[in-house]
């Protein structure tokens, strides 16, 4: 959009005076943020309405992206950038004497997700708007998100993340005209109506009111605005008597209170199922109502609507869609099923069997009795169809939806849709060959790969503005709208002046992070050290513990020889553990106690520092990632579906230290063997161990003095205050046979770390590697990923 500095200043002052009754000089940063965000909303609104009217008039096919998580972080700067007015606003603030950074930092991160799943969903919203496709998000308006992490005495403590603050979410708009009701619980019996149709009769069900809040998603440089719809829950006035107690009302409020409520109890499992169904049913109801306004037959809805299931949380969608089409709109089974399969598509995000969602059949039947009936019918018809094709009975049993008193949600998504995709080449291969091989034998045409991507605007233009400015000097600003122009940087990979400038920019980013570390933890770190970073969800398969084992080895090396020749190293962690995940919490405690041990030991001469930055989130990632020298991507080969932090680090010039897992393989293909450091077993070697059952971690431990010394450190009193946690980790590695092969990969990892040390000593070579990573990161833009989804799965047009 076009905006002069003078008009912006006038608009901003008017809104500040109108909303806050205050002058600029007297306003707090929060008041200034609220006024600025309201000003931006004023600019967005006509564009938003224009987009809505355009879609209604043109009746374009629209994709709806259902995800339990969306993790956009702060939205102010992204919205300003995408509108093309970021520089204008900064200039206006400078004239007003306002610090833009202070105002920007007054915004809370939108706490609607946890990790990569939510960040990917948010990136896709940005890319859909930027590429011009009609695509809307559908999720939950969590009041407290996952949790805010505090580290107390080394332990993770979870507190509510009250990200709404006292003023709410300035970006959202409540849409009362799209409110719908969602029924749960009760009994359902089937009866013939006056037309002879079998219809359900509900008794003793509970009714929830689903209230939509829309958040605009602005395209970069095109004034295009799509929509992220978030659902909140209310008790309908006409059903107030169904919720007579405070406890009953609280249980309703819990549905949209937090992401991933603890499911270790029956009540927790029930709440999760209700949460997932609530979001899915509400979204599908409004999609159908919107489609019917076009005056087209409902049986042809797939021609104008695509519903995408992001992981298994919304995988009840095919069954709920069938319920709506048949029970609410009188479609026959055949027409409803045809429309459902052609409308639905599904992204799988894991090969870990425990992460493929399953529900106890009795619990499911109790919460969603009619949907349960429909799932049984889908399952029975599937079994009959496959038997009619003379399939192996064992294959049929392996792939059915209802078995062993469980409902397999991934199976429902595959059978009830026309597409299933993995999120990296290796991941998709593993789905075909292993996790879902029986399904692949039945439906090979449904399987495809869509490697994940990231938003370059967030991670370069916003998070690393100094690097962006250096790139502008070299190749112009064309890359900002066409990321593939980054490849032009390769022309400068042997230019010493350019390499020196890139190295300087990285050092400046490290200095900014070092200041934050000192301020937030009290630990002083040197920017001359290698900043070695692992920031991601804490999970055993991601192997933060392997990183810690190496740190302990370095500690003992330095205790044995304080004069050891090594480049100083700062290991930086950021991670949240799921509240009920005891092992992950123990790893966090160990990292923090090792940090205390190392950072206070003056005999190490500052050569080794360990920092755990609490409450890892998008806005913190924007500070950490540009400052990283080394990107730790060390999951056990075959366990990480894709990863996206690896791409963000790559784009800002970190060198990837990685196993051949997920998208690391594709990063290696882009940068070449000389610009990445690979170690450890590949997936074939891991699978050979599984097949032969020949891995014996105690044997590795007992036969290797270095490993024994490191592992014993957990239980011999060297690390204070970890008696229970140290024993738990020791048991996991030795007694329980080291499930993720840390000890098997340990020596290869140590050698890779030594290679990092050697490479970093040659600053020019390191800067060249960094430049090559930046230049080839264009491969991983989510704009291209969305183009593939739109053309190959959703069949959309711009």
Where are these regions (language model features)?
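A conserved ligand/cofactor-binding region detector
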Residues: 1-798
């Amino acid at each position: 959009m076009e905006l002069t500095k003078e008009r912006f200043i006038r608009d901003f002052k008017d809104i500040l005076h109108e909303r806050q009754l205050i002058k600029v000089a007297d306003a707090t940063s929060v008041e200034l943020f609220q006024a600025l965000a309201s000003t931006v909303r004023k600019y967005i609104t006509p564009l938003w309405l224009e987009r809505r009217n355009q879609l209604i008039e043109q009746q374009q096919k629209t994709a709806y992206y259902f995800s339990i998580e969306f993790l956009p972080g702060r939205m102010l700067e992204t919205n300003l950038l995408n509108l093309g007015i970021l520089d204008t606003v900064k200039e206006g603030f400078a004239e007003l004497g306002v610090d833009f950074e202070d105002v920007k930092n007054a915004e809370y991160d939108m706490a609607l997700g946890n990790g990569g799943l939510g960040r990917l969903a948010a990136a896709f919203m940005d890319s859909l708007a930027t590429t011009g496709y009609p695509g809307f998000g559908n999720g939950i308006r969590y009041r407290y998100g996952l949790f805010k992490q505090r580290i107390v005495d080394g332990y993770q403590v979870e507190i509510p993340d009250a990200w709404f603050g006292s003023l709410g979410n300035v970006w959202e708009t409540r849409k009362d005209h799209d409110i719908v009701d969602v029924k749960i619980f009760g009994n359902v019996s089937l009866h013939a109506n006056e037309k002879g149709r079998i219809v359900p009769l509900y008794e003793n069900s509970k009714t929830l009111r689903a209230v939509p809040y829309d958040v605009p998603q602005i395209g970069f440089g095109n004034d295009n605005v799509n929509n992220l719809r978030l659902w909140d829950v209310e008790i309908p006035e006409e059903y107030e008597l169904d919720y007579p107690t405070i406890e009953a009302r609280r249980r309703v409020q819990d549905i949209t209170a937090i992401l991933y409520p603890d499911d270790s109890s029956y009540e927790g499992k029930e709440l999760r199922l209700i949460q997932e169904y609530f979001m899915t049913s509400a979204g599908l109801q409004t999609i159908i109502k919107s489609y019917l306004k076009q005056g087209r037959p409902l049986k042809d809805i797939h021609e104008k609507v695509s519903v995408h299931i992001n992981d298994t949380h919304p995988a009840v969608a095919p069954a709920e869609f069938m319920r709506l089409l048949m029970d609410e709109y009188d479609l026959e089974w055949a027409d409803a099923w045809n429309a459902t399969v052609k409308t639905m598509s599904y992204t799988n995000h894991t090969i870990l069997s425990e992460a493929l969602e399953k529900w106890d059949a009795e619990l499911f039947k109790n919460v969603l009795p009619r949907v349960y009936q429909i799932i049984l019918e889908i399952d029975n018809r599937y079994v009959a169809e496959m038997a009619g094709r003379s399939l192996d009975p064992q294959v049929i049993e392996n792939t059915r939806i209802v078995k062993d008193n469980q409902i397999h949600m991934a199976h429902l998504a595959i059978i009830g849709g026309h597409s299933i995709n993995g999120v990296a080449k290796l991941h998709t291969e593993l789905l075909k060959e292993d996790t879902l091989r029986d399904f692949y034998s039945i439906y090979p045409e449904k399987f495809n790969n869509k490697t994940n991507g990231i938003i370059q605007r967030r991670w370069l233009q916003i998070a690393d503005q100094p690097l962006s400015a250096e790139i502008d000097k070299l190749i112009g600003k064309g890359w900002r709208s066409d990321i593939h122009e980054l490849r032009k940087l390769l022309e400068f990979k042997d230019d010493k002046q350019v390499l020196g400038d890139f190295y300087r920019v990285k050092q400046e980013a490290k200095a900014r992070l070092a200041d934050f570390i000192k301020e937030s933890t009290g630990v002083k770190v040197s920017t001359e050290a290698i900043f070695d970073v692992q920031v991601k969800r804490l999970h055993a398969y991601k192997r933060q513990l392997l990183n810690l084992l190496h740190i302990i080895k370095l500690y003992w090396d330095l205790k044995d020889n304080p004069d050891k020749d090594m480049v100083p190293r700062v290991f930086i962690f950021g991670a949240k553990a799921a509240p009920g995940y005891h092992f992950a919490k123990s790893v966090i405690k160990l990292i923090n106690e090792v940090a205390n041990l190392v950072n206070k030991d003056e005999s190490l001469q500052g050569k080794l520092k360990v920092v755990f930055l609490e409450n890892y989130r998008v806005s913190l990632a924007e500070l950490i990632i540009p400052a990283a020298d080394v990107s730790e991507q060390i999951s056990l080969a075959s366990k990480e579906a894709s990863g996206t932090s690896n791409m963000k680090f790559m784009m800002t010039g970190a060198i990837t230290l990685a196993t051949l897992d997920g998208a690391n393989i594709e990063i290696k293909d882009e940068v070449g063997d000389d610009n990445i450091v690979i170690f450890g077993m590949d997936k074939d070697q891991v699978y050979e161990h599984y097949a032969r059952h020949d891995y014996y971690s105690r044997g590795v431990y007992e036969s290797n003095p270095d490993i024994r010394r490191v592992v014993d450190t957990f239980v011999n009193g060297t690390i204070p205050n970890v008696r229970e946690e140290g024993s738990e980790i020791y048991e996991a590695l030795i007694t329980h046979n080291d499930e993720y092969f840390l000890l098997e990969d340990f020596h290869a990892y140590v050698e890779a770390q030594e290679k990092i040390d050697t490479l970093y000593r040659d600053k020019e070579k390191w800067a060249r590697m960094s430049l090559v990573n930046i230049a080839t990161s264009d491969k991983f833009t989510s704009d291209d990923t969305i183009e593939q989804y739109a053309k190959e799965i959703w069949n959309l047009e711009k």
